[in-house]
């Protein structure tokens, strides 16, 4: 906890092609070892595949995918008198977006069906837009956990 007041959030620059901050965050999440140009090729390649297969604007498909993946509730552990309870809490908007992007990239990497990361990412985004895929399942599991632990909601802080 800083002594000089709250920490300011860094302003992220929009990506060069679509001029969109969400796409820039997606590129940063795909990036390994600071190799941004490779991450950009992967994301833009995935967008080309999405445009080819769906005939829609890739940004619209990404928006739909993120809306289906972003969690509304999650559980946080809270110690009360020697017992640890999983307390359901609402997810802040910034965290919702970052979790949604993280899960999309994570489950795209885990896919076994496609050969290249472009294809995997495109497939995961299209699946998420259609309410299927690993990332959507992760969101549903998170919501199920929150629902199961609803009895401990009064321990919120």
From Swiss-Prot:
Q: Does Lipoprotein appear among the keywords?
A: no
Q: Which residues form a coiled coil?
A: none
One MF annotation (Gene Ontology) recorded for this entry: rRNA binding
Q: Does the keyword tRNA-binding apply?
A: yes
Signal peptide (UniProt feature, chain positions): none
Q: Which residues cross the membrane?
A: none
**Superkingdom per UniProt:** Bacteria
Its keywords, alphabetically, are: Ribonucleoprotein, Ribosomal protein, RNA-binding, rRNA-binding, tRNA-binding
Disulfide cysteine pairs (residue numbers): none
Q: Name one Pfam family in it.
A: Ribosomal_S7
Provide GO CC annotations from the record: small ribosomal subunit
Q: What InterPro entries would the database entry show? A: Ribosomal_uS7, Ribosomal_uS7_bac/org-type, Ribosomal_uS7_CS, Ribosomal_uS7_dom, Ribosomal_uS7_dom_sf
Which GO biological process entries does UniProt record here? translation
Belongs to which family?
Answer: Belongs to the universal ribosomal protein uS7 family.
Described function: One of the primary rRNA binding proteins, it binds directly to 16S rRNA where it nucleates assembly of the head domain of the 30S subunit. Is located at the subunit interface close to the decoding center, probably blocks exit of the E-site tRNA.
Subunit note:
Part of the 30S ribosomal subunit. Contacts proteins S9 and S11.
Stated name of the protein: Small ribosomal subunit protein uS7
Organism, scientific name: Caldicellulosiruptor bescii (strain ATCC BAA-1888 / DSM 6725 / KCTC 15123 / Z-1320) (Anaerocellum thermophilum)
């Amino acid at each position: 906890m800083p002594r000089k007041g709250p920490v300011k959030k860094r302003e992220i620059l929009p990506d060069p092609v679509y001029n969109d901050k969400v796409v820039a965050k997606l590129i940063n999440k795909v990036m390994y070892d600071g190799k941004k140009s490779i991450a950009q090729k992967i994301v833009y390649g995935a967008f080309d595949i999405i445009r080819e297969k769906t005939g829609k604007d890739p940004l619209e498909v990404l928006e739909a995918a993120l809306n289906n993946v972003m969690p509304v509730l999650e559980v946080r552990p809270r110690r009360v008198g020697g017992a640890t309870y999983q307390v359901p809490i609402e997810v802040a908007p910034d965290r919702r977006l970052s979790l949604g992007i993280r899960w999309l990239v994570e489950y795209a990497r885990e896919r076994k069906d496609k050969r290249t990361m472009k294809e995997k990412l495109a497939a995961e985004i299209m699946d998420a837009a259609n309410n299927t895929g690993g990332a959507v399942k992760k969101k549903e599991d998170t919501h199920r956990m929150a629902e199961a632990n609803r009895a401990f909601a009064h321990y919120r802080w």
